[in-house]
Amino acid sequence: MSIPILALAVAIYGLASVGIGPFFGAFLGVALMALGLYTLAALRVFARPGRAGRLAGLPAALLLIAASAAWEIYVPQSDLFYSAALEDEAADDIPEIVTEDLYYAQPTLMQAALDGLAPGTPREPELFALLGAGYAYQDVFMSEVDRTATLLAARHGTGRTVKLANSEKEPTRLPMLNHHNLSDGLQALAGRMGPEDMALLFFTSHGSEDRLSLSFYEARLEGLTPHDLATKLDAAGLTNVVIVISACHSGSFIDELAAPDRLIITASAADRTSFGCADGRDWTDFGRAFFDIALRETPDFRAAFTRATRLIEGWEAEQGRPASHPQIAEGAEIGPVLDALFAIEISQGG
């Protein structure tokens, strides 16, 4: 019984060695553990009668379980599970990333980003923004950040937006979206905003049911959980906040972030995926519907959400995809601040 199981484990490793994606390492660790547990269970059913028969396959089962634990702890999966052939094909487009240089660049990049923030005009509602791209290995996320920044500059002027992005191809064009830079960016917004101003936080990345991916393997970043973001917002003292998250399962952020002075918009429900994160695209499906279409028709985030949701429902129905169910949660106190900001924008022809 243990010989076929070991053979299957070797086959799995062989598949991994040709490079089938950065997430395969986690799968292999789980697979090894499952194979070990399966072997233990099989011993109960198929082993020869007697103690010796039951113990015959025990070493193999324990070896698989130990291997799975060692795999998860010690093996640098992000380096191992990229195909060398695929890396060679893209070598001309991707610079060599030195982790030490990447981190040494952050203070300078972040200072330049924050120096570009202008203070708010007293008693005049204005929109400040922090935009973040979390996943370094697909260009669509940085593209969304850049294009959203361009849209906001046309609507609200320059000098009020901070951009953070993880990018394999342009690792030092913008500060990384990591925990430290995010905290500094939120505090900088809070320091420049007045009580009449609004902050837009937009995050675009992959997501799971408990976190937003901040994936940049050379930088060893940790994902952003709903609790992480809520804690950073509270620490910064940021008020009057619109939070837009374009990621799978992004609705899982709503309960933790909900507050009277916040409007929260997500691309999907907590148990649903969103779509459109392929390389070569300018926008994800939600980013396109919300920013590129709906917000060009209306300055009101709430009305734009309604318009974007209808667009997405239509696209998903046409393509036979499961519904993503975008979500919105409006705090009891943020409505008047939103209305004042949008009234000024409409009066100025925005």
Question: Where are these predicted regions, by residue range?
Answer:
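Second-shell loop/turn segments in exported
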Residues: 132-139, 167-176, 214-220, 243, ...
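Boundary/activation segment at the start of structured domains
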Residues: 14, 18-196, 281, 342-349
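Active-site-proximal C-terminal subdomain of hydrolase catalytic domains
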Residues: 21, 31-38, 242, 247-338
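Alpha-helical transmembrane segments with an aromatic anchor "belt"
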Residues: 1-7
